[in-house]
Design a protein with these regions (language model features):
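Solvent-exposed, low-complexity, repeat-rich "mucin-like" stalks and linkers
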Residues: 1, 53-101, 173-203
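Surface-exposed binding patches on compact interaction domains or structured appendages
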Residues: 1-16, 79-128, 194-212
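Hydrophobic loop/turn residues within beta-sheet-rich immunoglobulin-like superfamily modules
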Residues: 7, 20-22, 67, 76, ...
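Surface-exposed, short loops/turns at beta-strand junctions within beta-sandwich domains
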Residues: 11, 20-27, 121-123, 134-143
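A short beta-strand micro-motif common to beta-rich folds, especially ectodomain repeats
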Residues: 15, 26-38, 129, 140-153
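Edge beta-strands of extracellular beta-sandwich domains
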Residues: 40-49, 156-164
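Extracellular interdomain linker/stem segments of modular secreted and single-pass surface proteins
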Residues: 48-56, 164-171
């Protein structure tokens, strides 16, 4: 991770040492030696400072189709463990069931458990969580929830998960009613997820809607 410039030289000379950006949570070290043509040697230890503990998502937003299904959310971290939690919005909240496990640096890891082999010590790793079997949205409103990812040190990343609005639907419990000569009231029960209005229509329109 260290660049030496120049790598070789003669007599008195200033040598520059620079490093690649370090994303690991722990300091890293490289040991170097310099040797003359005559066999004299000296050693140098180069330390690079640790990066701050971090967790972040690849995107602040994720989406679910109105028909439901799965949604995968990814990000990066260098923490020793990650804990996932979901909070539905107060209005039009989306209910999500978190899985027991997620993937950290390619390894299946339990939510909130210490990550095997501590990959974050050396650098940032990729994490991924898949929320499965999101039900269809039967409302005409978008539904939202917040996925919160918390690192061991308390750092957080939030992702807003939005499910597209469902289709407007309406059902009647009868196709035909027959009023008596006095016009005595009868009831048709309407089941809908939307506002609705009655209006007169042509007979052919009604028959077509009924599939006749």
């Amino acid at each position: 991770f260290v660049t030496v410039d120049p790598v070789s030289g003669s007599v008195d000379h200033a040598v520059n040492f620079s490093g690649e950006k370090h994303t690991g949570r722990l300091q890293r070290t490289i040991n170097l030696t310099v040797t003359t043509n005559g066999g004299a040697k000296k050693a140098l230890v180069v330390n690079q400072a640790a990066a701050a503990e971090v967790v972040r998502s690849d995107s602040p937003n994720a989406s679910v189709q109105k028909t439901g299904g799965n949604v995968t959310i990814t990000g990066k971290s260098n923490s020793t463990k990650l804990t996932f939690a979901v909070t539905p919005a107060e209005e039009n909240g989306l209910t999500l069931q978190l899985p027991a496990n997620y993937t950290a640096a390619g390894k299946t890891t339990a939510n909130g458990a210490v990550i095997a082999d501590d990959p974050g010590a050396a650098g940032e790793f990729v994490w991924s969580i898949t929320i499965s079997d999101v039900p269809a949205n039967v409302t005409i409103e978008e539904l939202t929830a917040t996925l919160k990812v918390t690192a061991a040190g308390g750092q957080t990343a939030n992702v807003t998960v939005t499910q597209a609005a469902g289709d407007s639907t309406i059902e009647l419990d009868k196709e035909t009613i027959n009023l008596d000569v006095n016009g005595t009231q009868q009831t048709v029960n309407v089941t809908s997820n939307d506002s609705w209005t009655w209006a007169q229509a042509a007979a052919r329109t009604v028959l077509r809607m009924m599939g006749r």
